[in-house]
């Protein structure tokens, strides 16, 4: 079941909390190992608009958010470094591996035909300036080294329209929330609303991969021309 958060509350950049709305299904029932996705997807989907041209940046292969966007936005682009993003067959195979053969078999064809796909590096996006109303980047930034991450933010600034938004989540401590303001200062972006970097007692966390991991969300805005 999907809950709808208060509009003002969803704008705050902060740690994701256990009390936040979540969904266990987005196109497919979500994989149990994707511990933060129920919260991330439920939050991020609130920013989709029917008139938007959007990008799911580093979208993954089986990951369902890009498919969901095709039914809720005017034009949807998705890019990933993995060349399988260009292959319908490879996408279906990955869906079968993660969600089961029936999910792959019954994937509506329009999820693929409505999706403009590209193999791309976030530090060098193949899109024209000011193309997107919103860029979604879900649990990706923590995997980038500092130099690549800064170049990716500059690319996001370039491809966003003025007042366009970057809707991002990332794992902590692999990426530190207190660095966001520094990153904003050198990339032509700004935090849209309130930024709270203090970790609450009820922050969602996982020890699935060893040391505890938390998840942070950020609403970032392009204030002018790239």
Residues of each region from the PLM?
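A conserved beta-strand element that flanks and buttresses the S-adenosyl-L-methionine
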Residues: 136
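Short catalytic micro-motifs in class I SAM-dependent methyltransferases
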Residues: 139-143
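A short glycine-rich, Lys/Arg-flanked "PGG" loop and its adjoining helix->strand segment in the class I
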Residues: 150-162
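Conserved class I S-adenosyl-L-methionine
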Residues: 51-61
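Short glycine-dipeptide loop
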Residues: 50, 160-166
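Local beta-strand N-terminus motif with an aromatic residue
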Residues: 51, 132-133
């Amino acid at each position: 079941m999907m809950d709808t958060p208060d509009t003002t509350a969803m704008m705050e950049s902060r740690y994701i909390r256990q009390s936040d709305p979540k969904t266990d299904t987005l196109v497919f029932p979500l994989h149990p190992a994707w511990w933060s996705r129920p919260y991330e997807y439920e939050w991020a989907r609130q920013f989709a608009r029917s008139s938007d041209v959007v990008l799911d940046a580093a979208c993954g292969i089986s990951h369902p958010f890009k498919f969901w966007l095709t039914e809720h936005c005017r034009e949807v682009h998705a890019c990933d470094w993995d060349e399988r993003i260009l292959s319908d067959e490879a996408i279906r195979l990955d869906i079968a591996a993660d969600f089961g053969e029936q999910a792959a078999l019954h994937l509506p064809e329009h999820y693929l035909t409505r999706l403009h796909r590209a193999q791309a590096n976030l530090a060098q996006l193949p899109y024209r300036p000011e193309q997107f109303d919103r860029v979604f980047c879900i649990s990706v930034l923590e995997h980038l080294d500092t130099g690549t991450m800064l170049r990716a933010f500059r690319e996001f600034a370039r491809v966003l329209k003025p007042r366009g938004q970057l809707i991002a989540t990332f794992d902590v401590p692999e990426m530190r929330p207190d660095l966001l303001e520094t990153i904003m200062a050198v990339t032509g972006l700004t935090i849209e609303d309130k930024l709270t970097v203090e970790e609450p007692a009820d922050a969602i966390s996982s020890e699935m991969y060893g040391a505890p991991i938390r998840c942070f969300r950020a609403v970032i805005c392009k204030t002018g021309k790239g």
